[in-house]
């Protein structure tokens, strides 16, 4: 009787092992990949030219970051300014993964920022991601 009961137990054990083999892997920690592999061509300028509908000077920042796949969304978020005159500004690069499956190919991705600023002159801009400095822009010209 015990021998007859053994095959269903073995079958249940085999089925549970097969199902656990189908479990998904935990999402990979891409580490610095979420901040990109490399970045380049960072530029910033202040447009202080007067005009209709303008509420003051506008700060523009552009750059390019190599991301691990196509479809990443990159956003610059303004942080604190230091107390020097002219001030230095800090920005944090926020990244958002693409949804669904994507091709695994390093993709240069453009970053753009354009917002009104209260500063007519800026000494430097430091861009960080994941707590590390990604880029420092020392030359921020002003267009009058």
Regions picked out by a protein language model, each given a short descriptive name:
Residues 65, 78-80, 93-97, 117-119, ...:
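A mature extracytoplasmic/lumenal domain signature
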Residues 54-56, 79-89, 116-121:
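A short, structured loop/turn motif at beta-sheet edges
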Residues 23-25:
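Bacterial signal peptide processing site
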Residues 18-21:
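C-terminal motif of bacterial Sec signal peptides marking the signal peptidase cleavage site
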Residues 39, 107-144:
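C-terminal partner/receptor-binding element of secreted or periplasmic proteins
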Residues 37-81:
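Short, surface-exposed binding/anchoring microloops in extracellular/periplasmic proteins
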Residues 1-11:
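Bacterial N-terminal signal peptides that target proteins for export
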Residues 89-119:
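An anionic, turn-rich surface loop/hairpin at beta-sheet edges
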């Amino acid at each position: 009787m015990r021998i007859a009961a053994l095959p269903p137990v073995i079958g249940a054990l085999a089925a549970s092992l097969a199902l656990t083999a189908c479990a998904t892997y935990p999402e990979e920690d891409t580490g610095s990949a979420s901040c990109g592999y490399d970045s380049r061509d960072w530029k910033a300028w202040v447009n202080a030219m007067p005009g209709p509908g303008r509420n003051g000077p506008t700060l523009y920042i552009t750059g390019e970051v190599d991301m691990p796949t196509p479809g990443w969304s990159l956003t610059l978020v303004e942080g604190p300014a230091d107390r020097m005159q002219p001030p230095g500004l800090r920005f944090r690069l926020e990244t958002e993964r693409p949804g669904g499956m994507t091709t695994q190919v390093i993709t240069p991705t453009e970053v753009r920022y354009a917002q009104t600023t209260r500063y007519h002159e800026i000494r430097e801009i430091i861009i960080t991601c994941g707590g590390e400095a990604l880029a420092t822009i020392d030359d921020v010209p002003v267009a009058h």
